[in-house]
Regions:
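Conserved active-site alpha-helix within GNAT-family acetyltransferase domains
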Residues: 111, 136-155, 162-164
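Acetyl-CoA-dependent GNAT
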Residues: 21-92, 96, 101, 114-115, ...
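A generic structural signal for beta-strand entry/edge sites
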Residues: 90-92, 128, 166
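Conserved GNAT acetyl-CoA-binding A-motif
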Residues: 121-134
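Generic structural signal for conserved hydrophobic packing positions in ordered secondary structure
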Residues: 39, 95, 129-131, 139, ...
């Protein structure tokens, strides 16, 4: 388990926390109700914002595949977000199911989760991390985050094809 700290504020029980927020990012087996609810919310939003044929988010069973490692972020007993990494081959992995809980948005949690995945990828010696996200305005904050971390737009990878509703991005690790 990795402990990360963010100094940005987030709302908890109706009040804004101004001090540093210590979060725990842990390997997750997808058995907890809070995680299942967050993933159901994630899928519902994906289908509400993109045509069904352009939704590449995985359901619970898909995330339990052996090539996928799933992480969740917590403050005490409160779920802040989740992310997964899918091994495509020994040098290439895909970021999947990045989601921040509604109350924890704009608090730095997504940055902590993304950094955790990049650190995990470096330890596993992947050379490239790729991802698919939507092209709609709803996904602009996610694209901005990925760009901030150095991801650039790329050609289709794995089983993806060009799609006007998708943006494909990747980063080369050092």
């Amino acid at each position: 388990m990795k402990r990360a700290t963010t100094t940005k504020s987030f709302i908890e029980n109706g009040s804004v926390l101004e001090s540093s927020v210590s979060i725990k990012i842990k390997l997750d087996d997808l058995s907890g109700g809070e995680v299942v609810e967050l993933l159901e919310e994630h899928l519902a939003d994906m289908y509400a914002t993109s045509p069904a044929e352009s939704v590449h988010a995985l359901d619970l069973d898909g995330l339990k595949s052996p090539e996928i490692t799933f992480f969740s972020a917590w403050k005490d007993s409160r779920l802040l977000g989740c992310v997964a990494i899918k091994e495509l081959d020994t040098q290439h992995a895909e970021l999947k199911s990045m989601r921040t809980s509604q109350f924890a948005r704009k608090s730095g949690v997504a940055s902590q989760l993304l950094q955790h995945v990049l650190d995990t990828a470096a330890v596993r010696q992947y050379k490239t991390i790729s991802l698919e996200t939507g092209s709609e305005d709803y996904f602009k904050p996610a694209r901005n985050l990925y760009e901030k971390f150095g991801f650039g737009y790329c050609e289709p990878f794995a089983d993806y094809v060009l799609d006007p509703h998708s943006q494909l991005m990747s980063i080369e690790l050092r």
